[in-house]
Amino acid sequence: MTAANQNYGTGRRKSSSARVFIKPGSGNITINQRSLEVYFGRETSRMVVRQPLELVELLDKLDLYITVKGGGISGQAGAIRHGITRALMEYDETLRPALRAAGFVTRDARRVERKKVGLHKARRRPQYSKR
């Protein structure tokens, strides 16, 4: 892929990291050499990936080439959405206010809370026995 007339954005969510390249085209979305429909079986994940493009009405005007690694399905979809948003802002800075208002620009900083000693999970305490 040549560097001419393409824009790049990096997205992260949980432990997933996505690299997104956008260039003018017909709306093809390729994720790790597979189509969006093949890569994400769940419609929810596909919808999350398409959200920023639908918001700025560029879904069928840009081709996306994406590599994503780490994490699970939900985290990867979120990372891709974040990466697409950043690439779109590099492509056209006037899209920033609309993307910001939709909440796509902000990196979701929530992480998995660690398990503590003496507890079952991060916050789940052992059952209390009165007697």
Curated annotation (Swiss-Prot):
One of its GO terms (molecular function) is structural constituent of ribosome. SUPFAM superfamilies: Ribosomal protein S5 domain 2-like. Keywords: Ribonucleoprotein, Ribosomal protein. GO terms for cellular component: cytosolic small ribosomal subunit. InterPro entries: Ribosomal_Su5_D2-typ_SF, Ribosomal_uS9, Ribosomal_uS9_bac/plastid, Ribosomal_uS9_CS, Ribsml_uS5_D2-typ_fold_subgr. GO terms for biological process: translation. Signal peptide: none annotated. Gene3D superfamilies: 3.30.230.10. Pfam families: Ribosomal_S9. Belongs to the universal ribosomal protein uS9 family. This is Small ribosomal subunit protein uS9. It comes from Haemophilus ducreyi (strain 35000HP / ATCC 700724).
